[in-house]
Amino acid sequence: DQNTYDVFRDGSEEIGNNPDFQKYKGKLDFVFTSPPYFNREQYSQDENQSFKKFSAYEDWRDNFLRPTLTTAYEYLKNDRYICWNIADIKVGSDKYIPLEQDSIDVVESLGGEYKGIYKMLMTRMVGIDASSVKNSVKIDNTYYKFEPILVFYKP
């Protein structure tokens, strides 16, 4: 057997509509991805960027987050896992946009199971009090910020 690959330039919210990509439906062994955190990660000012196409969070959730997770789930084989690196976004002093819970809700609505979270530690950031950050963990009396990796299972 020879390994092959295809490169697609479609956005993750649209790739499931690409006829050339559809041959992979139900054939992926594992999915690991880190989608943009709504409008916090702006990779470019291109009009096709998700934060440009969907400027309101509810639009982004319904037209980017949901189709991206749906494609990841549907293209995964049964009895396999998705690792999804996404974090809630802080708005103001004490409110958050619930990207983590919204992701869990989408996968569970598809029949997937939320299995838990891995905490990917970040390097220490100068000028940031990691103990005051939502996603932080204390190790040897030092606080570290972490990126959540949500783990989902497709039965």
Say what each PLM segment does.
Residues 1-155:
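Class I S-adenosyl-L-methionine-dependent methyltransferase catalytic core
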